[in-house]
Every structure is written in C-alpha cells, then in structure tokens.
Design a protein with these regions (language model features):
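A residue-level structural signature of the nucleotidyltransferase/glycosyltransferase Rossmann-like core
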Residues: 36, 88, 170, 177-178, ...
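Glycine-rich N-terminal loop/short-helix segment of MobA-like nucleotidyltransferase
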Residues: 1-13
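Hydrophobic packing residues within well-ordered alpha-helices of enzyme cores
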Residues: 1, 47-48, 185, 189
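Left-handed beta-helix
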Residues: 182-337
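General beta-strand structural signal in soluble alpha/beta enzymes
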Residues: 37, 60-61, 90, 121-125, ...
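Residue-level signal for inorganic ion chemistry
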Residues: 19, 75, 94, 137, ...
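Conserved core of the sugar-phosphate nucleotidyltransferase
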Residues: 100-217, 240, 290, 314-315
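Conserved N-terminal catalytic core of the sugar/cofactor nucleotidyltransferase
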Residues: 11-92, 98-104, 108, 316
Length: 337
C-alpha cells in the first residue's frame, strides 16, 4: 500500500481511516505478514499507530518524495529478496470500494493472471466525468472474459483531452491499482527506467537486511522523480487491464469526495468541521474538527485545510492543484506540502 497523509482521516464516520480501511480490505485475501506499507519517514509513527498489526519491517520509509516509480521499484526489490517469485498488488491507501466482494474477486483473478505470465495488469473503471487526476486506458483486443490488452495508456491528460476521452466512450480510468509478478515489474524497470533500476539494483545484497535502510537513505534521493504511469505503463507493450464495477472512488480527488458525501439543501458538503453557510451552494468544506467555517456568497468552491496549508479554489479547477503544489515546492520548499 502507498500511504499518504490525508489517509489518516475518517471522512465518513466509519471509525476507520482510509488507510485502515485499505488494510482491512486486503487482509481478506493477503496474509497480514505479506502486507507492506510504503510511506515517507514523516509518517512512520502515524502508520504504526493506525496499523499496529504490522511490524517495523513491513513499513518501508522513504527519506524523501520521489514519486511512484522509485517507490514501487524499491518495494519490488525488497519483496524479491524475501520471495523471488512473489505476485504483487500495488494499491493507494485513499480509495473507497463500495462493492468489496466484487473487488476482491477481481484481485484474486488478477493475481492468478499475472502469476502465469510477464504481463503488467491494472484495473479499469468507466469514467463518469472528465477528470485530469487519473490516467486513461484505451483497450484493444479482448483476450478472455476478464482481461483486455491495453492499446494506449495516457497519464493525467489536460482537461480538454480528458473531455475527448470521456466523450469517445473508448477510454477507462486507470484506478492506480496494479498487479504483476515481481520479476515482471523489475524487468520492465530495467528496460524502460534503466537509471532507476541501476541505482536500486546496486543494493541487491542489502535488501531484507538491517543495512537496507542506510542504503535507501543514501541512494533513494538521487532516484529520478517519475511516476509509474509515465515511466512504465505508458511505454510498456505488455500492459493489460481488468474492467469492473466495484463502486470505486479515488478519494485523492476532491471531486470524488464531493460526489460521495452527504449534501445539505444547497448542495454543500461539510466534512469534519462545523459550518455556517450563507448564500452559498455547491461547495465542499474540509477543515479540522475544532474549526468553524463561516462562508457567505461562494458557489462551487473547495475550502480545505491540512496541517499548515489552507486551500481555497474553484471546485472545477481541481486540476490546477498540481500546479499549486509545484509552485509551493519551488518557492517554499516541502514544508507546506
């Protein structure tokens, strides 16, 4: 599982955070001792607090953010040192799954599929809006009742292109959930991301040992900053997709969170905090529990606070958040991201 900061939150009052719900979901089909969490050093205590079932060796701590390709590559080398023929599920920790039995069935079928081939598998979801925060999958031939060959894989397109994809009816969202054999993904990395593969393969003798953390702390920051989608999935010729309806939503996007949340009579969503809204509609407000939001005259806005950052922007301009993050990193460093 890939853990991010906001996954500590219980958005829907279930008593379990998004991270804990993801763990609960996967432990139904994967032994607890085989579950790993990859996260930043900053969140080590948080993960240990939320998932006491895991021991420290099951929590891989990145010394710095380097995007998903280095994260997944490191986990693959680590896993191969423990099990040279492991089959792997890579899952973000901010997903909501409403149809868990169908989802877990797809996971089990997917693991069986990648166990007998060198294919890289992703889950595809039929889109209901042009969303720039997801990758888009165009399918080619249907190889059996569950799997399709991927024709094109486009990582997080601009809004106009996303609109074209959705209107065509030929594209599916990439759910950001992948399955593969450990040797298949390492081979793909060696072919398509040789710089990254060379850097991490240099630690082959220390993975799974007490020296692993020192090696990662020294070498991980120099890994190329590239996503698994752009670095491998867009370029590989052995990518397949399993299509399904799992009641899936990526709560890493505010649009998804708004769609799934209970609304007041003016279509406003308030989560965690309390609010007084006047002459306002179609907004989503996410503030800490001890905060009161008093809002007058806003329509279609996102107002969200996390630690030391307050974000206020048009809800339909969510695709600009990537720009805000990049600008903040360039101008202010990572203290506010």
């Amino acid at each position: 599982m890939r853990s991010v900061q906001h996954c500590r939150l219980d958005f829907f009052g279930t008593g379990r955070s998004l991270l804990q719900q993801t763990f609960d979901r996967f432990k139904q089909v994967i032994p607890t001792e085989n579950i790993l969490v990859v996260t930043n050093d900053l969140y080590a205590d948080l993960v240990k607090e939320q998932l006491p079932e895991l021991n420290s060796e099951q929590i891989l701590l990145e010394p710095t953010r380097r995007n998903t390709a280095p994260c997944i590559a490191w986990a693959a080398y680590h896993i191969r040192a423990l099990n040279p023929n492991a089959n792997i599920v890579v899952a973000p920790s901010d997903h909501l799954i409403l149809k868990e039995s169908e989802f877990l069935s797809a996971i089990e079928k997917g693991l069986a599929f990648v166990a007998k081939s060198d294919k890289l598998l992703t889950l595809g979801i039929k889109p209901n809006r042009p969303e720039t925060g997801y990758g888009y999958i165009q399918v080619a031939e249907h190889i059996d009742s569950s799997f399709y060959k991927v024709k094109t894989f486009t990582e997080k397109p601009e809004l106009e292109l996303a609109k074209v994809f959705v209107e065509s009816g030929e594209f599916y969202w990439n759910a950001g959930l992948f399955m593969w054999n450990v040797n298949s993904i390492i081979k793909a990395g060696e072919l398509l991301l040789p710089e990254l593969a060379t850097k991490l393969a240099a630690g082959k003798d220390v993975y799974g040992t007490p020296e692993e953390k020192k090696f990662i702390d020294e070498n991980f920051p120099a890994c190329p900053n590239v996503s698994i989608d752009f670095g491998i999935m867009e370029k590989a010729d052995n990518v397949y997709v399993s299509l399904g309806d799992f009641g899936w939503s990526d709560l890493g996007t505010w649009g998804s969170l708004y769609d799934l949340s209970q609304k007041d009579e003016s279509e406003n969503v308030t989560l965690k905090c309390r609010s007084l809204l006047y002459n306002s509609k179609n907004n989503i407000v996410v503030l800490p529990q001890n905060k009161l939001a008093v809002i007058d005259g806003l329509e279609g806005y996102l107002i969200a606070e996390s630690d030391n950052v307050l974000l206020i922007c048009k809800k339909d301009e969510e695709h600009s958040i990537r720009k805000y993050v990049n600008d903040a990193q360039i101008k202010l460093g990572e203290d506010y991201i």
